[in-house]
Regions:
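Bacterial N-terminal signal peptides that target proteins for export
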Residues: 1-9
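A structural "domain/chain start" motif
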Residues: 2-3, 18-62, 67-77, 121, ...
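Bacterial N-terminal signal peptides
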Residues: 9-20
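Residues embedded in well-ordered secondary-structure elements
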Residues: 10, 29, 73, 100-102
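Surface-exposed short loop/turn segments
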Residues: 67-68, 81-128, 132-149, 163
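Individual transmembrane alpha-helices with interfacial aromatic-anchor signatures
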Residues: 146-158
Length: 173
């Protein structure tokens, strides 16, 4: 024989285990079957960062359109409405050259989300979903370069958080 019986049974056993335990890749779930279309309302921004609500909302819309599991519609035609609040944005120093000279900082967002039906009944909600991204502080205290690094980190963070929210939303159903 070309294969060993031990390997054959091991493969069969693993196949049964993975198919039986609901194993799936992140984001491969579905929102409820009665939700065929969704409206994503621009998120409320409770941070001091201007424009972060548009950035995050657009990144979240991209995640839904990329996957094509549901159609995006206007609020009056959608089966569900996704709303949310960007609660906070924190920036903390994570490494230093000395007590006065930061080398790297971390930006963090936290969001609350709610998916409701057109009547306002909550289908899904979660609070405090967060992610973070590090960025370099420019040498010689060059504020322009540091600010640019922070903006790039904020954009990367927004994309990653939108992906995380999408995966969390679809994994629950």
């Amino acid at each position: 024989m070309f294969f060993n019986k031990k390997y054959f049974w091991a493969i069969i056993f693993l196949g049964i285990i993975f198919s039986a335990c609901g194993y799936r890749f992140s984001g491969e779930g579905n929102i409820p079957s009665n939700v065929k279309s969704i409206f994503i309302k621009i998120f409320e921004n409770r941070t001091g960062e201007t424009g972060v609500e548009s950035l995050f909302t657009n990144d979240l819309i991209y995640e839904f359109t990329r996957d094509r599991k549901v159609v995006l519609r206007s609020s009056d035609k959608a089966d569900a409405i996704l709303t949310g609040v960007i609660k906070n944005m924190r920036i903390r120093t994570v490494s230093r050259e000395n007590s006065q000279t930061p080398l790297e900082r971390r930006v963090q967002f936290a969001v609350d989300l709610k998916l409701t039906d057109p009547n306002g009944s909550v289908i899904w909600s979660v609070n405090g979903v967060s992610a973070n991204e590090e960025y370099n502080v420019a040498p010689d205290n060059n504020k322009h370069v540091t600010e640019q690094n922070r903006r790039v980190a904020t954009a990367a963070l927004s994309k990653r958080l939108a992906e995380k929210v999408y995966n969390d939303l679809t994994a629950d159903f």
